[in-house]
Curated annotation (Swiss-Prot):
It is found in: Cytoplasm. GO terms for biological process: regulation of DNA-templated transcription; rRNA base methylation. HAMAP family: 16SrRNA_methyltr_B (MF_01856). Its EC number is 2.1.1.176. Keywords: Cytoplasm, Methyltransferase, RNA-binding, rRNA processing, S-adenosyl-L-methionine, Transferase. PROSITE patterns: NOL1_NOP2_SUN, SAM_MT_RSMB_NOP. Its main location: cytoplasm. This is Ribosomal RNA small subunit methyltransferase B. It comes from Photorhabdus laumondii subsp. laumondii (strain DSM 15139 / CIP 105565 / TT01). InterPro entries: MeTrfase_RsmB-F_NOP2_cat, MeTrfase_RsmB-F_NOP2_dom, NusB-like_sf, NusB_RsmB_TIM44, RCMT, rRNA_ssu_MeTfrase_B, rRNA_ssu_MeTfrase_B_ent, RsmB-like_ferredoxin. The keyword RNA-binding applies. One of its GO terms (molecular function) is rRNA (cytosine-C5-)-methyltransferase activity.
Length: 429
């Protein structure tokens, strides 16, 4: 049975909703995927993520191929052209199919009169592809980052910025966390190999496995039974730094979607975990993950700046604060971050992090441990944030995560195979 939709036009709509309406792909794609077949969902994701990964390059190429940019109601066709060029430059889709489907996308988008324009621009790109792609390696579009973010990264990492940028522009690896309640990591590796899935263990993590060629979770042995969870290596490490212990009261603040909550409970299944997040919709994901993994926690909707509304005068032995942040360490996983984030957001996020840290500190027991974590690579949110916190709180001290140049542990993307992350482990005197 032939599909009644055009996938390229749907992708153009996804790009439009990100760039012109400020929505994230993680919000946009699930809604758009409701009306397409399971077979087409990976391609929609590949095209949407791919276009946003190399956006400046596509913008520059279209600027070379067209005299006037498409504006107003025709702007959606600008994004359709991006989808077409991305297919020709970066995918194995046969050129004739990429052209035909993209041109038909103009009809689906109710711009039949511009089919010829779309066809002409794409064919012109085909003729000039080698020359144009070579030019993009030597012009302002080369780094594939907004100028403000590139400048900040260069300032923060004068020796490593190129490595960091290159990592951001790659497709991310797929990491798993083995639930050791059911299997050891080596046992699960054997199950993967028996299923024909190539994988390798992380050198220093007790639970992490990297899938060599990312695959649907539905084919992972025991995924629906809670044997394994998809979670980046760096995200796993911050829970390991927390060192949860059975019998303790543990708070996971800003917990959604619940990956760290469930890992706490896998390490210490008899701990009393409270998982809190401000987003009611994302709290549903926490509950879903707890159910799949057969874990039990108290789940609450609440603002980290106002624990008096949900903490009920409790004090905790350990607190994991995965703070709201710029997410600049996970750009390879969420390339839309580059275009949704604004430079002025950083100061606001730093202020929010500071307020949450100050508000939650009194709820940590004496001699208790707090792990502050972000998926950011920017010093303002990380080392500098912890430096300011230590100056405000004389009863706080770092506990073994500091390095020579940082009050905590800063990981840049791909350094250990994981995402960009920051951790600081604090104890209360």
């Amino acid at each position: 049975m032939k599909n009644t939709y055009n996938l390229r036009s749907i992708t153009a709509k996804a790009i439009n909703q990100v760039l012109d309406q400020g929505q994230s792909l993680s919000t946009v794609l699930p809604k758009l995927q409701q009306n397409i077949t399971d077979k087409d969902k990976p391609l929609l994701q590949e095209l949407s993520f791919g276009v946003l990964r190399v956006l400046p390059q596509l913008e520059w190429i279209i600027g070379q191929l067209m005299v006037k940019p498409l504006k107003g109601k025709q702007r959606i066709l600008h994004y359709l052209l991006m989808v077409g060029i991305y297919q020709l430059a970066y995918t194995r889709i046969p050129a004739h199919a990429a052209l035909a489907e993209t041109v038909n996308g103009a009809v689906t988008l109710k711009h039949s009169q511009l089919k010829g324009l779309i066809n002409g621009v794409l064919r012109q790109f085909q003729r000039q592809q080698l020359q144009l792609m070579e030019c993009t390696q030597n012009n302002s579009s080369h780094h594939l980052h907004p100028e403000w973010l590139l400048t900040r990264i260069q300032k923060a990492y004068p020796q490593q910025w190129q490595q960091l940028i290159n990592a951001n522009n790659k497709k991310p690896p797929m990491w798993l966390r083995v639930n050791r309640i059911y299997h050891s990591r080596d046992e699960y590796l054997t199950l993967l190999r028996k299923s024909g899935i190539d994988a390798e263990p992380a050198p220093k993590s007790p639970s992490a496995i990297r899938i060599i060629s990312p695959c649907p979770v539905t084919i992972l042995p025991g995924f629906d039974k809670g044997w394994v969870t998809v979670q980046d290596l760096s995200a796993q490490e911050c829970v390991e730094l927390l060192k949860p212990i059975n019998g303790e009261k543990i708070l996971d603040l800003c917990a959604a979607p619940g990956g760290k909550t469930t890992y706490i409970l896998e390490i210490a299944p008899e701990s009393q975990v409270v998982a809190v997040d401000i987003d009611e919709q994302r709290i549903k994901r926490v509950k879903e993950n707890l159910k799949r993994l057969n874990c039990h926690a108290t789940v609450k909707t609440g603002d980290g700046r106002h624990p008096e509304h949900w903490a009920e005068n409790q004090q905790f032995d350990r607190i994991l604060l995965d703070a709201p942040c710029s997410a600049t360490g996970v750009i390879r996983r969420h390339p839309d971050i580059k275009w949704l984030r604004r430079e002025e957001d950083i100061a606001q996020l730093v202020q929010l992090q500071s307020e949450i840290l100050d508000a939650i500190w009194p709820y940590l027991k004496k001699s208790g441990t707090l792990v502050y974590a972000t998926c950011s690579i920017l010093p303002d949110e990380n080392c500098q944030q912890i430096s300011s916190f230590l100056k405000r709180h004389s009863d706080a001290k770092l506990a073994g995560t500091e390095t020579n140049d940082c009050l905590g542990k800063q990981i840049i993307p791909e350094l250990n195979g994981g995402d960009g992350f920051f951790y600081a482990r604090l104890t209360k005197r």
